[in-house]
Amino acid sequence: MTLRWTKEASPRWDADKRRLFGPAELAAVGLAPPGPGELVADEWWRVTDGDGVVGYGWLDTEWGDARITFFVAPGRRGRGVGDFILEHLEAEAAARGVNYIYNVVPETHPDGPWIKNWLSMHGFREAPRGQLHRQVQATPTRAQARASDSPR
């Protein structure tokens, strides 16, 4: 499986996002469903393979840190797509000089315990206000090298 990481120049709420981000998932991270075709905030990347869109990564840089969120198509979970997205989001954060990446998993999230465990296994530590954070790697990875070369 060859995964591709593509930045969305003008991210909009479309059928693929609706398919992956159900109302419960959006509500769990404090977002209301946008209208069809509506612009969505911050930076978005889509992950594709030969079968189409299999995931999304989202990054919001603020005060030297970056909040990240990512979604993987249910049929593709457990196959490395989440690892791929996390590696690329960290590369994007490093290219922007970010110190920490973090994710907030609300208590109401339908898969909260599983996600917290997965993030913990990937080096994230719990912090106040329900955040799980991890320091951005100083040593560039292949994904970071690609991110620094990609257009913003």
Annotate the PLM regions.
Residues 1-35, 145-152:
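Short amphipathic alpha-helix that is part of the acyltransferase structural core
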Residues 120-152:
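C-terminal "cap" of GNAT-fold acetyltransferases
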Residues 110-119:
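Short, low-order "capping/linker" segments at domain edges
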Residues 12-28, 45-47, 86-91, 124:
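Compositionally biased, non-globular sequence tracts
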Residues 69-78, 107:
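A short, internal acetyl-CoA/4′-phosphopantetheine-binding micro-motif in the GNAT/acyltransferase core
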Residues 78-94, 117:
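Conserved acetyl-CoA-binding loop-helix of GNAT-fold acetyltransferases
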Residues 46, 51-60, 67:
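Conserved beta-strand in the GNAT
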Residues 93-108:
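Conserved GNAT acetyl-CoA-binding A-motif
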